[in-house]
Structures are given as structure tokens and as C-alpha cells.
Amino acid sequence: AEEAPQYADGLQAQMAQAQAMLEGLGYAKAGRMPVQLVHATQAMELDAELQRLTTGQQRLSTTVPAATFAVMAEKRSTLSMVIDHLLEHAPVLKTADAPEALALPKDGSPFGSVEVNKDSCTLCMSCVSACPANALQDNQAAPQLRFFEKNCVQCGLCVSTCPEKALNLVPRLLLTPQRKEVRVLNETQPYG
């Protein structure tokens, strides 16, 4: 029996994200699909498709050494280690004009940034309360809206919660070490 169509749509969106990352990092040529969905109803059919993929022209254009980390129970931690491994060996990052970030498809992006319109933001911190991943943070010592890009899952709760409509999502993969650092998005001087 065929699965619900929304499962296939979700898989296609995730595959588009993976393809964009692999192409952007220099592992795959545009138009070649190293990430493919295999449809099989029988074990023999699955085996034939896997054989076709491993012997065909769909492999990565660059060999990546095997990763040496163990898979974590928490999926986001494992994904973070996979990204770190791919970045460490990425062909595009070995060039003089290496990009700082890769734009990702908006649909289903697991990574990204948040832009703040500082003229509209009143630092009410509604977005901080709404953020399930602790990507948006306040500062107990000063009126600051801070952001930890590594944690952002692009869910959009911050955008929909903001009463000033001052936030926008930016689907991307930041390639610099700053993706693992907290940065200030907006701040004001405290009264006093």
C-alpha cells in the first residue's frame, strides 16, 4: 500500500536540503543527485536499486573519509556532528573565495538565522519565550536579544509570536565557527 502523500513530500523536502548542502559544499555537481529516494516493494527490487546507485554516476564528486563519531540518541547532536565532518572535508572551503554561508531551500530547512528589524523590535522577549530550541535567548544582565544559530531549527514560532513583526527567518547553513557562538541581534542601554 502507498504511504500518505505528506510523507513523500516531507522526504522530498529533506532530500532537497541535503542536496543543497552537498552541492554548496562542493561534494556534488549541480544536476547530479547523490541523495535519492528509492521506491521498492520487494527485497530484490531494493537490492537492485541499491546496486544501481552504488555503481552508477550518482556518487559524490569527492571522496569523504569515514566519520569516526558514534551516533547519538538525540538526532540534532548527530546532525551537528555530520555537518562538522562534512565541513572539515568540504572542497569549497579549501578555496580562497570560500563562502561564509550556504543559502538553503526555505521549505523544511533545519538550519538558519533570524533577522531582526531593530527599528521595530522593542526587546519584549516574546520570541525568547516561544523558541523551543533555545536559539533565541535573553541576557539577565542587560537588555539584549541573543541568538545561537546552531540551535535554530527554523520553526518560525519566533516570527509568529513577535507582536512587532520584527523577525524574519533566513534559511542557511553558516560555514564559519560563529554558528556555534551566541551573538547579539538587538540591544539597548539599560536605564539607570
Where do the language-model regions lie?
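Accessory beta->alpha helical hairpin/"wing" motif in late/C-terminal subdomains of nucleic-acid enzymes
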Residues: 146-148
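Catalytic machinery of carbohydrate-active enzymes
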Residues: 20
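Short, surface-exposed alpha-helical segments at coil->helix boundaries
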Residues: 12-16
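Ferredoxin-type iron-sulfur electron-transfer modules and their immediate structural context
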Residues: 4-11, 23-140, 151, 160-192
